[in-house]
Amino acid sequence: MITKNEALDFLKLNSINSILEKLEGINTQNSSKTITFSKNAFIPVCNWCRNVCGYCTFRNENFKLLKMDEMKEILTKANAFGCREALFTFGENVDENEKVKEELKKMGYYGILEYLYEISAWCLENTNLLPHTNCGILSYDELEYLREVNASMGLMLENSSARLCSTIAHEKSPGKDPNLRIEMIENAGKLKIPFTTGILIGIGETLEERIDSIFEIKRIHEKYGHIQEVIVQNFRSKPLIPMENYKEPSPIEMFKMIILSKLILEGISIQVPPNLNRETGQLFLMAGIDDWGGVSPLTKDFVNPEAPWPDIEELNSFSKELGFELKERLPVYEKYISKEWLDKKVLEKIKK
């Protein structure tokens, strides 16, 4: 077990030998030498959001709300491509936008969650894809409602420090209050929803705040046992965002955070997005990641549209180069495929 003080000392190290010593413990954890990925389709249901984060390009005041037929067409194509995950994403509290609400009303829906539920249920009934929803803060009741049609759900913690709410990253983003995000992650645990969360590196946080965030995820998981994977995501600068000139975290910063995450979060998969780390992905594989996350042969990453997915053959090639076997997985990890963790209709779909 590593303490917070030991973790901080490790992040401050500039000795390659001392850093590599920590890898000995990592290498014994993934003795199977496998790295997983999920073949998915990214469905950006609506790109309006109440949050205006300093690093984001997803939000658009001139929003687009995908029509039901558009989503069904994407899902049908994804099914033909052999995808098994339908990633449904939209901005937080889109119902706050009267124009979005009016569009939904014209189509016969009282809100975005009813709309999402219907397309998710259609997805389960008509394709081999399993829904995974990531749409910002949801209440306990909303999570319970969506659990019926989701194999797993997700919300990035990003960081557990409230200090960032007064910085350029989150000063215009009420939904990035860490207390709200922690409450939702805990509620997902109470409801036994297999869950994905993660931290965002390079948005103005201190080393101590990075460590506190990982330990907060550990605390929640030890209480509820529902966190199946943790994403260690690096900030990437983009043109025309408020944080355009902010420095990106170095590969060594990421390398050390991955090692720490693997040591602290025992039994939880650690993921790094491969499209944000095409040049450094193999380095992070050496540091202990065991999952590449969702990769789509059909749709782009609408949150990071400037960063195309590597194709699966490319992922396979540089995984094999380090002796790892690339293995496809579902959006719900195998240990959560049971009636304890999944709604009956989702479980029946998987067993078919």
Curated annotation (Swiss-Prot):
Residues of the Radical SAM core domain: 35-275
Organism superkingdom: Archaea
Cofactor, free-text remark: Binds 1 [4Fe-4S] cluster. The cluster is coordinated with 3 cysteines and an exchangeable S-adenosyl-L-methionine.
Swiss-Prot/TrEMBL cofactor(s): [4Fe-4S] cluster
Tagged with keyword Iron-sulfur: yes
Reaction catalysed by this enzyme: 5-amino-5-(4-hydroxybenzyl)-6-(D-ribitylimino)-5,6-dihydrouracil + S-adenosyl-L-methionine = 7,8-didemethyl-8-hydroxy-5-deazariboflavin + 5'-deoxyadenosine + L-methionine + NH4(+) + H(+)
CDD domains for the chain: Radical_SAM
One GO MF term: transferase activity, transferring alkyl or aryl (other than methyl) groups
Quaternary structure and partners: Consists of two subunits, CofG and CofH.
NCBIfam families: F420_cofG (TIGR03550), PRK06245.1 (NF004884)
UniProt-recorded name of the protein: 7,8-didemethyl-8-hydroxy-5-deazariboflavin synthase
Organism: Methanococcus maripaludis (strain C5 / ATCC BAA-1333)
Phylogenetic lineage: Archaea, Methanobacteriati, Methanobacteriota, Methanomada group, Methanococci
